[in-house]
Amino acid sequence: MVGSLESDQTLSMATLIEKLDILSDDFDPTAVVTEPLPPPVTNGIGADKGGGGGEREMVLGRNIHTTSLAVTEPEVNDEFTGDKEAYMASVLARYRKTLVERTKNHLGYPYNLDFDYGALGQLQHFSINNLGDPFIESNYGVHSRPFEVGVLDWFARLWEIERDDYWGYITNCGTEGNLHGILVGREMFPDGILYASRESHYSVFKAARMYRMECEKVDTLMSGEIDCDDLRKKLLANKDKPAILNVNIGTTVKGAVDDLDLVIKTLEECGFSHDRFYIHCDGALFGLMMPFVKRAPKVTFNKPIGSVSVSGHKFVGCPMPCGVQITRMEHIKVLSSNVEYLASRDATIMGSRNGHAPLFLWYTLNRKGYKGFQKEVQKCLRNAHYLKDRLREAGISAMLNELSSTVVFERPKDEEFVRRWQLACQGDIAHVVVMPSVTIEKLDNFLKDLVKHRLIWYEDGSQPPCLASEVGTNNCICPAHK
């Protein structure tokens, strides 16, 4: 076994170049290959509760080992020949071409791919690490804390909390914001029960498992919004324990916004005083969009919430995953501890934190400002309505929640089509998330491709699935609900 590994790692440069030549025309590590897809696994979506055969099969993504790029040892004379450098440059050039092509057909995930951070290229030569508390400088001097705190202050103003009353940090992703917010709630109420709607992001239930929390999954309305009648029943059944709630400011699949005011009212009517509940608002995508919609309800610390998190790589358009988590200063004491090694305090989830992300966020917040984001939000909502209307005109069931840019429609029958357009699917539905980088032209290309393929999928006379149970009868235009 060891011998085979060594032989793999000592491939001659001639062999590498030969392989590169073979790949030169169609090198695409992310393309859908013609080889059979991996075997399906059952995920239970749509399962028959009576034990019948109603389970839906989920197709996993292909094994990346089929397209992995080997790491090989440089040859002794490589510094003179430069073959290895030329090989790597060619691979990277082709990979860049792949990224350009894949970006053209990106629709299903909430990432804004329209950005230009060329001005920050000069800072990529530094190992910038914001370990520890953002507000206290550590012994490690290569950091970007002034930029990070500037970004945090901007979000504090957005969510209406005074500088001296909040604590927060720039996270490595949206999930970390949820993990931190729920952890603060758990530390405040060690015996508290976590309540989250069934359509909450999977990271919320991951947090419950990690922290060994009792968790109640609350039913949702057709829109995907939390059902406060079901929440009331579950709260009344557990009145003896504090409540820790996850409130969705945009659910993952349907883009539904939980009614924060109704959630608070339900808690109060069930006898939970403000010192017996903690609310974390998962605003991964819409937490930054809603403040710029005039008719949208406010997410604000003027209400009895404990924390808000938002992703930085989604609507903002940061090129690396990151996020912002803000909580009340009075709450963070339950997590904070002194770290002599850093000469600082720490209440974050991670140790080392990406010091480049604050630079990108600071740069784009300064360039766009409130007015710039407002224009982009209006564009996204307008284009989302355009897509929904065109789908309905084409005879395709579609739903768009108010305040949302997530358009839900019937799941395409062909997994290759799903992968080509990078659609997110669940059960019989798929969705497109309209971001600032999604243009009318891109939507028209998608619609044209979808309509063309549907003619093929249903040419045998079969009918598209009824989506009434997923999107409601008003949005379903299957033969039974036209």
Curated annotation (Swiss-Prot):
Claim: Cytoplasm is one of the keywords in the record: yes
Subcellular location: Cytoplasm, Cytosol
Summary of the tissues where the protein is detected: Expressed in roots, leaves, flowers and siliques.
Residues reported in the UniProt entry to bind substrate: 201
Disruption phenotype: Dwarf plants with necrosis along the edges of the leaves, multiple inflorescences and sterile flowers.
Gene Ontology MF: a single term: pyridoxal phosphate binding
One of the record's GO cellular component terms: plasma membrane
Modified residues (N6-(pyridoxal phosphate)lysine): 314
Reported regulation of activity: No inhibition by ethanolamine, choline or their phosphoesters.
Induction: By nickel and manganese ions.
Catalytic activity: L-serine + H(+) = ethanolamine + CO2
Alphabetic keyword roster: Cytoplasm, Decarboxylase, Lyase, Pyridoxal phosphate
Essential cofactor(s): pyridoxal 5'-phosphate
Enzyme nomenclature, EC number: 4.1.1.-
GO biological process: carboxylic acid metabolic process; ethanolamine metabolic process
Gene3D superfamilies: Aspartate Aminotransferase, domain 1, Type I PLP-dependent aspartate aminotransferase-like (Major domain)
Pfam families per the UniProt record, alphabetical: Pyridoxal_deC
Membrane spanning residue stretches: none
Additional notes on this entry: The mutant phenotype can be rescue by exogenous application of ethanolamine.
Family named by the database record: Belongs to the group II decarboxylase family.
Subunit structure comment from the entry: Homotetramer.
Function comment: Catalyzes the biosynthesis of ethanolamine from serine. Highly specific for L-serine and does not attack D-serine, L-phosphoserine, phosphatidylserine, L-histidine L-glutamate L-tyrosine or L-tryptophan. Decarboxylation of free serine is the major source of ethanolamine production in plants and ethanolamine metabolism is crucial for the synthesis of choline, phosphatidylethanolamine (PE) and phosphatidylcholine (PC), and thus for plant growth.
Protein's name according to its UniProt entry: Serine decarboxylase
Organism: Arabidopsis thaliana
